[in-house]
Structures are given as C-alpha cells and as structure tokens.
C-alpha cells in the first residue's frame, strides 16, 4: 500500500498539472479570440481604409480631394449610367423576385419541386452566363431573334444590361423571400380566411405588408449588385459604360490605383449607407416573422385565388422561369454543337479544347474552393460562437465589420486587397494566399449567419452545465458546441464551395497569370467571342457545384434518417 505521503504527493502533482493545463487552455482560448478579431480588422477594415486613404492622396503626398473632381469630370456619364441601370434593375429584379418567391411558396407537389430545381441551378451557375446566353439567344445571329424570328437586332445596349442583371439577381432574391414567406404566421392567414377575406385581400393586406422589409432588402441588394457588376456592361453593354466597368478597365489597362480608388469611393460610400439600412430592415423583418411557423410547412395561400394580383405574379414568374430554362438549355447545348452553314451537329471538339487549356485551371478552382470551404467554415463557426455566446467587449462593432463585405462591391474589396497587401511587412500580392483570404472574408457574412442560426438552437444551459462539471472553455467548444454545429458546417461548406467556384468580382484583380481560375477562363472566352468554349466551361462549373450540393444533401438526409432510427 502507498504511504500517505506518496498519495499526497501524487495529488499535489495532479493538481499542479490541472492548473497548468487550465492556464494553457485559457491562453489558447484568448489566442483564438485574438486571431479572430485581428483577422477581421486586417482583412476587412484595413483594405477598406486603404481605398479611402489612397483616394485622398494628392500629387504632393498630402490630403487632396482633386481626384474626386477628376473622376466626376471624366466619368460623370458612367456614374449616371450606373445609377440609371441600378434603379431599373433593382425595381425589375424585385418585382420578378417577389413573383417567383410567391409562386415557389404557394406551389404544390411537382410544381414546387420544379421551381426549386430551376432556382437552384440558376443560383449555383457561374457569372457571365446570363450575358453568354443573351448573346446566343437574342444577338444579331441569335437562335430566337435571327433563326426563329428572322430579325437582326442590336442587343448591345443599356436595356440588355438591365434585363440580364435583373434576371441574374432574381434567384438569390427569390430564395431569400421564399424563406421569409415560409416564416409567416399561419394563424393570421387562417383568421383572415375565417373572417371571410378573399385570397386577394389576404395577399394585399397581410402577406405583402409583412414581407415589405424583406422586399426593400431585395431592392437595396439588387441596386448595390448592379452598381458593382462590371462583367455584364463589358460583355453586352456595347458603347454603354458604367462606373464598375470603367474601374475594371482603369485597373487592368492603366494600373492607375489612385484614380480607381477615387472611382471606387463613389461605389463604396452608398454601399456602406445601404448596409446600415439593410441591417435595420433585417431586424424589422425578423420582428415581423419570428414568432411564426416552421420552414417545412406550406404557405396556406393559392395565387390563382388572389385575383388580378395573383394572376399577374403567375404570368411574370412564368416568363422568368421560361427564360431561365431557355438560358441554361442554350448554354448546356452550345458546348456540344457545331454550326456549319447554318446546320448544327454534335461535336466534342470543344471538350478537347477545354481539356487542353482549361483542365489545370478547373482543378485549381476546385482546390481553392475546397480550401476556402474548410477554412472559411471553421473560421465562421468560431467567430459566430465567440460573438454570440462569449459577449466580448465591442461585439457589435466586430459583428458589423464581419457583415460589411456582404454589401461591398467586389471591385472595392479586390482593389482594397491590392493596396493593403502590396508591400512589406505583409506582401501577399502574386500569391495564392491573397486570393484565398479574399474569398474567405467576402463569404464570411453569410457563413457566420448560418452558424449563428444553428447556435440559437443550442441552449446555453448545456454549456453552463459542462462548465459546472469542470470542462474548460475549449473542451466545451470541442465537445458541446462543435457537435451541435455539424449541420451548419455542411451548409457553410456548400455555400463557401459554391461561392468560391463562381466568384469573380472581388478576386479578378488578385489572380496571378500563372494561377488562372476557371471562372476567368469563362470570362475571357465570352469576351473573345468563343461562345462554345465558354458554354462548356460554364456547364462544367455548374455540374461540379451541383454534384457537391447533391452529395451534401445525401449526407444530410442520411444523418436525419440515422437520428430517426435511433429514436
């Protein structure tokens, strides 16, 4: 038997070991928090500040506003064009989005499934695909305008830009509005029906007022996205130019960072103003729809019973869905068709061309997307936990900063990274790291929101109970929080992968010529008029993303079935 002295010695040794482990765990916890907050300041706030500082730099190195006057004189028309297109695009896109969302929320059976599939394909497709399909369908030699209607129209104008931007913004807006509609209180709709209200009255007096804040959010987001879009005006704008397109040409053609920074300020300032309006509207929307129903139930409303408003929305959404089907059908077919004297035949020559010049870029795109998906998801989970549960000082400020990239134009965020990380001690330009960091923090707002929503389902009492039983902060994070965030991990992974495969605006200035990505091969092919190759690249990107999303769906469904079988 051990002596009392030996037992006491072992106890003291174990106690000192526990104290040392606790100190190390607390230090690691503080280090994680410091890295999270420092990364947000470094990779979000600092690039934005660099744009503002560079735009105010005068010829003598002092502070000067002269560059803003130069921009207004030289690019005043482009600025007016941007506002013109933004307003029309925002209104048209919001009307189409609201119509499509109501159709999706009220449809039944296979109709609802079909609408959701079309929306999903449109959401995960790469940029520039709308412009590509627009040229092939409605161009001077378009399938519809020329071959079917025998018309030779000039599609390169402002109205083409407005139409394509509006259609490309609808899927994301409509899915957002569908989520809001699914949260409406069924009791309010049922009470109105019991009191004799018609479908049209319920839609006009209950549904539309409840989703008005969310509708205004779509309006703001569409306007900001239109301001930031450079690809559509460059490809189908013709002589019509916008400020975002001029920024792209200014950086790529002249490398004038001072002027491009000043030009970006005209996009950055309204975006930041709209950002705070967006946050206020989202809080109001949450108050109107929070005490509602589960997302799996159907909206108890039928649009055909809603009078002229309902039928009008059905007509608009039908036009939208038909255009989307035509658009993607055209793109998928064009990659395997060859025209000879007006006769089309099946061919694989573009596939061989893609394999020769684009296989490495496609693999690199997948590699980057996987890295950003894993790293970005872990970062978002940690950031959401520390902001939501730890209640640190300045939490509101850091949460606001982390959400800011959601509203920033891609060109602003990209040029900000060039200015911020183009010199010692943190020179990242020309490396893959700057591209990965830009992708990660551009997608951080949505990833954090997904994780925060999952955290809301985890009672804080479980964390407190674990702490009361002696678990350290990191042990609680590892054994309690992370397992509860497993569904959020998969959702964030899919979102980050999809966004990384299809992003263009924020990283177009950061890509090294030796490290091209597939989405920029697509842009080059469209810009150079190689539409068949562009169609094939777009199809491959879309199929890769859909495969990843399908795999994630199967994993989620298998996990749900396993939990049901256990119960």
Question: Which ranges hold each PLM region?
Answer:
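Glycine/proline-centered hinge or cleavage motifs at structural transition points of membrane proteins
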Residues: 195-197, 209, 469-471, 483
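Glycine-rich helix-loop "coupling/hinge" segments at transmembrane-helix boundaries
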Residues: 230-254, 339-343, 504-531, 565-567
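Juxtamembrane inter-helical linkers in multi-pass membrane proteins
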Residues: 198, 286-303, 340-354
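Membrane-water interface segments at the C-terminal ends of transmembrane alpha-helices
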Residues: 28-59, 71-182, 210-231, 262-280, ...
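A short amphipathic helical element positioned immediately N-terminal to and/or at the very start
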Residues: 63-72, 346-355
């Amino acid at each position: 038997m051990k002596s009392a002295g030996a037992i006491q010695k072992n106890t003291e040794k174990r106690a000192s070991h526990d104290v040392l482990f606790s100190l190390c765990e607390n230090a690691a916890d503080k280090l994680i928090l410091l890295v999270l907050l420092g990364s947000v300041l470094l990779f979000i706030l600092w690039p934005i500040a660099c744009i503002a500082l560079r735009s105010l730099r005068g010829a003598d190195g002092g502070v000067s506003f002269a560059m803003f006057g130069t921009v207004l004189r030289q690019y005043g028309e482009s600025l007016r064009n941007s506002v013109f297109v933004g307003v029309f695009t925002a209104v048209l896109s919001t009307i189409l989005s609201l119509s499509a969302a109501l159709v999706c929320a009220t449809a039944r059976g296979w109709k609802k499934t079909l609408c959701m599939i079309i929306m999903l394909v449109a959401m995960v497709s790469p940029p520039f695909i709308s412009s590509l399909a627009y040229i092939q369908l409605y161009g001077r030699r378009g399938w519809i305008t020329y071959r079917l209607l025998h018309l030779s129209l000039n599609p390169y104008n402002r109205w083409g830009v407005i139409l394509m931007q509006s259609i490309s913004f609808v899927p994301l807006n409509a899915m957002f509005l569908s989520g809001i509609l699914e949260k409406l209180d069924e009791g309010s709709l049922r009470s109105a029906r019991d009191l004799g209200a018609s479908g049209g009255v319920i839609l006009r007096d209950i549904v539309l007022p409840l989703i008005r804040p969310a509708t205004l959010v779509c309006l703001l987001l569409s306007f900001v996205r239109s301001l930031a879009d450079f690809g559509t005006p460059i490809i189908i704008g013709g002589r019509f130019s916008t400020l975002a397109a001029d920024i792209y040409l200014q950086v790529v053609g002249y490398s004038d960072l001072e002027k491009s920074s000043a030009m970006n300020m005209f996009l950055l300032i309204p975006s930041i103003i709209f950002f705070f309006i967006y946050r206020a509207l989202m809080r109001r929307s949450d108050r109107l729809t929070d005490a509602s129903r589960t997302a799996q139930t159907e909206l108890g409303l039928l649009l055909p019973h809603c009078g002229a408003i309902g039928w009008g929305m059905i007509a608009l959404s039908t036009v939208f869905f038909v255009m989307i089907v035509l658009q993607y059908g055209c793109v998928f077919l064009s990659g395997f068709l060859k025209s000879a004297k007006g006769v089309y035949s099946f061919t694989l020559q573009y596939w061989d061309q893609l394999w020769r010049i684009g296989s490495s870029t496609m693999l690199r795109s997948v590699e980057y997307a996987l890295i950003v998906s894993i790293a970005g998801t872990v970062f978002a989970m940690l950031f959401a936990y520390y902001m939501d549960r730890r209640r640190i000082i300045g939490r509101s400020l850091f949460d606001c900063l982390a959400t800011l990239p959601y509203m920033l134009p891609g060109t602003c965020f990209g040029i900000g990274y060039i200015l911020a990380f183009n010199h010692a001690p943190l020179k990242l330009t020309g490396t893959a790291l700057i591209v990965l960091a830009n992708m990660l923090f551009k997608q951080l707002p949505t990833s954090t929101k997904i994780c925060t929503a999952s955290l809301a389902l985890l009672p804080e009492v479980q964390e407190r109970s674990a702490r009361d039983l002696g678990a350290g902060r990191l042990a609680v994070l590892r054994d309690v929080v992370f397992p509860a965030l497993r569904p959020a991990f998969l959702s964030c992974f899919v979102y980050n992968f999809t966004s990384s495969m299809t992003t263009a605006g924020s990283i177009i200035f950061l890509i090294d010529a030796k490290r091209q990505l597939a989405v920029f091969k697509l842009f080059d092919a469209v810009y150079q008029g190689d539409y068949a190759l562009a169609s094939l690249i777009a199809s491959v990107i879309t199929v890769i993303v859909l495969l990843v999303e399908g795999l994630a769906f199967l994993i989620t469904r298998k996990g749900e079935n396993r939990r049901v079988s256990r119960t």
